[in-house]
């Protein structure tokens, strides 16, 4: 516990939780306090001006981060015939249909993303109770149910992240690693914010981007001055 307290004290000295920082400074501070022995993830939380209780104001989608996520992603694809071949050629680790479904039912899920061709949903739909709680259920809103499975595989490998509002109307996403440069993190954050702006529900009123904060896995969190994102 002493080490944690020491770390917390060091973070508190560097980052003022009441202050809004220009985006580059916020990311710099978060990187400086990411002192764990592993390559910490850099995460962002975005408070949106929506009513999360209303279904027409939920925000969900995906975006390919220009600088990637720094994570190696294993992809499973439900497809047959030419689409299955295209998925393999694009780099999918696991491709199948009934055999893949049986593998999942047996608890063998050594993958991070599941993609499905629309014609396989009769099989995939029956796996909802297994894939859903793990955040793996394919969904057309995030581009994981698509006839173009090859492009979906390439996007997943290139650093695509999925996002959706939680019960408090907050989006949580990873925008890179502590080893990333400030410019890479800033570019990824800008891409995410741009995607969120484009996904703004028509029913959302008032200020849409309410608060943005960046943090690392074990380090501190810093609030971002939203105006600095477009500066």
Curated annotation (Swiss-Prot):
GO molecular function, one term: structural constituent of ribosome
GO cellular component terms listed in the entry, alphabetical order: cytosolic large ribosomal subunit
Keyword Zinc-finger in record: no
Matching InterPro entries: Ribosom_uL1_bac-type, Ribosomal_uL1, Ribosomal_uL1-like, Ribosomal_uL1/biogenesis, Ribosomal_uL1_3-a/b-sand, Ribosomal_uL1_CS
CDD domains xref list: Ribosomal_L1 (cd00403)
Pfam family, one: Ribosomal_L1
Annotated signal peptide: none
Keyword Zinc-finger listed: no
Top-level division of the source organism's lineage: Bacteria
UniProt keywords, alphabetically: Repressor, Ribonucleoprotein, Ribosomal protein, RNA-binding, rRNA-binding, Translation regulation, tRNA-binding
GO process terms (BP): regulation of translation; translation
Family: Belongs to the universal ribosomal protein uL1 family.
Alphabetical list of HAMAP family matching this protein: Ribosomal_uL1_B (MF_01318_B)
Subunit structure: Part of the 50S ribosomal subunit.
Family matches, as NCBIfam families: rplA_bact (TIGR01169)
Protein's name according to its UniProt entry: Large ribosomal subunit protein uL1
